[in-house]
């Protein structure tokens, strides 16, 4: 992948599956993800965002040496709207600087009924308008990897809403 590409991954898990992530080795899942799909340098950063109070992560994760330095996690204190988190200055700074991979976990759509939690257009991998089929095909391996890594937590209804976006910076 080109270094100028930032990948945005949204995992809109069903509420009854959110608890699965509390006891999984998310660090190993994330490391496998960045190794196979978006090689990172030691100084690159990943931000993990949970929009549901039921999912609580440590602020900093420990990754194998040589993978990446640190992963950041922002928590939503109230599960009402994703826009409240996305508009924070902290996230905006990461999106325009050193952020390369962004993973969002939530269990609710926004006001429009879509999972467009981040700036830009989140592309649905399973249900594409004609003009977006090319991007969907390009990111299909990423969708397949996420399906494999989160198999125990994700169902068909989750995968239908799985969104990935690649934005040139």
UniProtKB/Swiss-Prot annotation:
Annotated family: Belongs to the FAM106 family.
Protein name: Protein FAM106A
Lineage: Eukaryota, Metazoa, Chordata, Craniata, Vertebrata
Gene transcribed to yield this protein: FAM106A
